Amino acid sequence: MPHRKKKPFIEKKKAVSFHLVHRSQRDPLAADETAPQRVLLPTQKVNDEERRAEQRKYGVFFDDDYDYLQHLKEPSGPAELIPSTSFATPLCDKTEDPCVYSSTGIKLPSSVFASEFEEDVGLLNKAAPVSGPRLDFDPDIVAALDDDFDFDDPENLLEDDFILQANKPTGGERMDTESEEDDGHEWEDMDDEEGSDDRSSAGFLSDGGDLSAPGSPQEAMKKHLFWEEETKSRFTEYSMTSSVMRRNEQLTLHDERFEKFYEQYDDVEIGALDNAELEGTIQVDSNRLQEVLNDYYKEKAENCVKLSTLEPFEDQDLPTNELDESEKEETITVVLEEAKEKWDCESICSTYSNLYNHPQLIKYEPKPKQIHLSSKTGIPLNVLPKKGLTAKQVERMQMINGSDLPKVSTQPRSKDETKEDKRARKQAIKEERKERRVEKKANKLAFKLEKRRQEKELLNLKKNIEGLKL
């Protein structure tokens, strides 16, 4: 019966492989709980030779199956979906659930594949809060979000006709007289130049209005002066109005505290520098000078010790009439200096100790005994406890006969041996020698008899062998 070739269950040439990956965050179905969160991604077959040739262009010469070109692509570059030539794209209809691959005829539901249309921004980026200051927000809105907005303040409440009030033109306020006197010269020249230009070009205003009238552009320019609005702080040297958030009461309180703190470091508040030579005079009858002298005398008095306190008078118990009149008592004041404490080397080295240096006395430690290893076993010698006799050794000791024991002639002679012991020892040696001679003679005779017997056997064996030959 001919062998039939079995049809394979999967044809590799027509098969389609998929990767199970997570659904993209830009996919609209990512937020749908009923849709599966993992989708099938068709694999793209790439020729190994073409891939390796492409890798060699970029200096990658590894001969393996790993795709190193995926690390050379720009992660932020534009990506395009290119259909593979090995399989056809799934032909799915919006109304039909199953998708059909034309090359293989595989029918799979559309929910297992990614959506055809994707959003520009993913779900995670949409839900992520915006960190940092938002310049596009109104300061009042920022204050309200930060719970700094005072809803009870009547000024913060809007009127019913706030739109009409906002559109109503308002007259500009005039500048202060002090600022006009300080900064008016710079604007006077500009007024003259601009006035002359206006008169020369268009003449006076038809309605007889003045350039400096309230609401005019000139007045508005003077109102919003840069040096009038900007206020620099001591600790930043930057404008306080340049802050992103509006300064509420708490932030203003912090600013004032920092201002007070940095006022202490102004040039006027800083005192004399270190190591500065201070010169001056002091009166002779000054109380401060008297206190210094009293302290000096007290220190000297503490160092001085009277002789009477050191050596009491020996004859103080004698009556006064027994004392020699010729002898006169003389009081001598002896100044004794305190004995200086003598430090040893260890104490002196201890004064040099710090966080990293800890000096101490160097102790002499004897050199440890060298360990010798056994040449046979490699085990350290004289370390393990000595073992006793084994069972075999004990059995052999019990099997020893009297003949195996050492003879008297081989035993060492004692130095404290007496004449009787010497005589007995010599007699025992003679008997041992006599026994040895008898034993030796018997052994010789036994060897001779054995030799004769073996010679006879050899002779008979030779004769028998010769008789058997044909």
Swiss-Prot record:
Gene for this protein? Ltv1
State where composition is biased (Acidic residues). Answer: 178-196
Which Pfam families does its entry note? LTV (PF04180)
Q: Which UniProt keywords apply?
A: Coiled coil, Phosphoprotein, Ribosome biogenesis
Q: Where is this region: Disordered?
A: 25-53, 162-222, 400-437
The protein's role, per its UniProt record: Essential for ribosome biogenesis.
- Biased composition, class Basic and acidic residues, residue ranges: 413-437
What InterPro entries does this protein's entry cite?
A: Ltv1
The domain of life for this entry's organism is: Eukaryota
Entry-annotated residues carrying Phosphoserine? 17, 24, 243, 326, 403
Family designation: Belongs to the LTV1 family.
Q: Which residues form a coiled coil?
A: 414-470
Protein name in UniProt? Protein LTV1 homolog
Carries keyword Transferase? no
One GO biological process term: ribosome biogenesis
Q: According to its record, what are the GO cellular component terms? A: cytosol; nucleoplasm
